[in-house]
UniProtKB/Swiss-Prot annotation:
Highest taxon of source: Eukaryota
PROSITE patterns in alphabetical order: LIPASE_SER
Regions of this protein lying in the Cytoplasmic compartment: 1-5
Substrates-to-products reaction catalysed: a triacylglycerol + H2O = a diacylglycerol + a fatty acid + H(+)
Protein name: Putative lipase ATG15
Species in which this protein is naturally found: Cryptococcus neoformans var. neoformans serotype D (strain JEC21 / ATCC MYA-565)
């Protein structure tokens, strides 16, 4: 007869010996894992090379991560945060179906190249003329699968993904996204405790391109790539990547090469006068090696080579979130973004798998943002916007996959302000508080926000609904709760570590650049 040892037996008994209000039991498909940073990643032009080189940095023994349960703004930029004995940060996982091509594309741009090759091949076959240069051979290595026949060329694979119904998981991934901005040991790090330290890429002084960190669990079964967002003047920061960040923001999220008006210098030559823009020209511009989405291929392929048996996740904030999403769509990897600009526009120009062939709930992409962020909501444009003043053409608003939307304008009474785009603001003032689960809170408040999120974008500065009293909202929605206090007996029983996350929805009926006409004018 098998008799379990003391350690194993204790694991059975601990749940019954703990506090009288234990956390909800996980389902068989749900488990909690911990990570630590193992690498840093980045890319830069080395030795006069024509293409950027991917750089890695293994974790330093002196690398330290910091956590906080108070606003980071309480400290100066150069202040070294103290080591805190905060609760261990956890990520809860679950199983989810993700639709993937049976044959993985070699690169992100393979989708666009395959589409172009097949279109030219089709036109060459059906046009009986001697202009043979219009027809090229179909690529032998990889052909984009047909989304019209998902059963033949696609597989719905059960994958381990972060459980985004769990608030602690949403916060932990947001902190990983925040850590992508700063080098190990810097003042902006959060303590990740049992999480493996990441491998930051591109942190050398001359590394002016894509940056971030790589996290892994103890068994290297799950690896998380975090990618840095924009470091530029519109967000109150800068650094060596600011120039590339601005170029890629304007190329990815503008309607036509950042040609906002006559005073702007376009980032590509696709403008055809009026509100006309060259579609093929735009697609060609996006496959340039200088674009972060393209360089992300090298990063993803290198990580899969280093961890061949691991499940790869991606996360990032702002531009880093959009790049994470584009990589995830290309390779069928789960991605969680924070305050990302609408990346449906560049995804469609790269011919990545999108609805209706790729249902939003099978894409594995989830965007987390709030309604007071003009960048994520797609309203940071026009001559009086801060984005315009800083030279950013942030004109897209539609997101791929599913969206977890926090209606901070209606519920918290926030004004639309580009400063709320910062990841620290999101962690401290949005994610730190539990939002009502289905059936809780003021009736109709959340439903109104979700149903009309894209129509409300143009009037997002509207005052708080008269039917909602601010004090009542604070009581119902738990604003100001920051979790267990450090003093004995100071715990807040109303603060919940798990749950309290809005339900993901797809952004149906969203349209970008409705004034523009795209065709072949160049």
């Amino acid at each position: 007869m098998y008799i379990p040892g003391p350690l194993r037996l204790s694991s059975y008994l601990l749940p019954f010996l703990s506090s009288p209000s234990p956390p909800a039991q996980s389902s068989p498909d749900t488990r909690t894992i911990s990570f630590k940073p193992v690498h840093a990643h980045g890319h830069a032009f080395v030795d006069n090379a024509s293409t950027p080189t991917l750089l890695f940095l293994d974790q330093s023994p002196s690398a330290s991560l910091y956590a906080h349960d108070y606003p980071i703004g309480a400290f100066g930029d150069d202040y070294v945060l103290p080591r805190l004995t905060s609760d261990v940060l956890e990520i809860r996982t679950r199983k989810k179906l993700i639709r993937r091509p049976k044959v993985r594309p070699p690169r992100i741009i393979s989708w666009a190249q395959s589409y172009r090759a097949q279109a030219l091949h089709f036109n060459g076959i059906n046009n009986n003329n001697d202009n043979s240069n219009k027809s090229i051979s179909l690529p032998e290595s990889w052909l984009a699968p047909d989304l019209a026949n998902p059963s033949d060329e696609w597989s719905d694979v059960e994958v381990t993904v972060p459980d985004l119904t769990d608030r602690q998981t949403v916060i932990t991934l947001a902190k990983m996204s925040s850590n992508a901005y700063v080098t190990p040991g810097g003042a902006g790090w959060y303590t990740l405790n049992d999480w493996n330290a990441s491998m930051p890429f591109g942190w050398e002084p001359d590394a002016d391109g894509l940056r971030g960190h790589v996290f892994a669990d103890e068994k290297n079964e799950t690896v998380i790539i975090s990618i840095k967002g924009t470091s530029a003047g519109v967000l109150g920061s800068g650094g060596p990547t600011a120039k590339n960040d601005k170029f890629n923001d304007n190329l990815l999220f503008s309607c036509c090469c950042a040609r906002v008006d006559f005073s702007w210098t376009p980032v590509c030559d696709c403008y055809a006068g009026g509100y006309k823009c060259g579609q093929t020209c735009l697609e060609d511009a996006l496959v340039s090696e200088s674009v972060y989405a393209t360089v992300g291929t090298n990063l993803y392929n290198n990580i899969t080579y280093m961890y061949p048996n691991a499940t790869i996740w991606l996360t990032g904030h702002s531009l880093g979130g959009a790049v994470s999403s584009l990589i995830g769509l290309s390779f069928g990897a789960p991605a969680v973004t924070y305050e990302s600009p609408g990346e449906l526009l560049p995804a469609s120009r790269l011919h990545l798998p999108l609805p209706p062939g790729m249902p939003a709930n099978l894409s594995g992409i989830t965007h987390v943002y709030h309604t007071a962020d003009p960048i994520a909501m797609g309203v940071c444009n026009g001559p009086y916007s801060s984005c315009y003043a800083a030279g950013f053409a942030m004109e897209s608003k539609c997101h791929t996959g599913e969206t977890i939307l926090y209606d901070t304008v209606r519920v918290k009474g926030w004004s639309v302000d580009v400063r709320t785009h910062r990841i620290e603001e999101v962690i401290d003032k949005v994610l730190a508080d539990p939002w009502p689960e289905e059936g809780e809170g003021k009736s109709g408040v959340w439903e109104k926000a979700v149903e009309g999120w894209y129509r409300a974008a143009d009037r997002v500065r509207a005052a708080l609904d008269e039917s909602v009293v601010r004090d009542d909202v604070n009581v119902w929605w738990g604003w100001g709760r920051r979790g267990p206090k450090r003093q004995p007996g100071g715990e807040d029983p109303g603060w919940r570590k798990h749950g309290g996350v809005p339900k993901p929805v797809s952004e149906e009926d969203c349209v970008d650049c409705y004034k523009w006409e795209f065709g072949e004018w160049n």
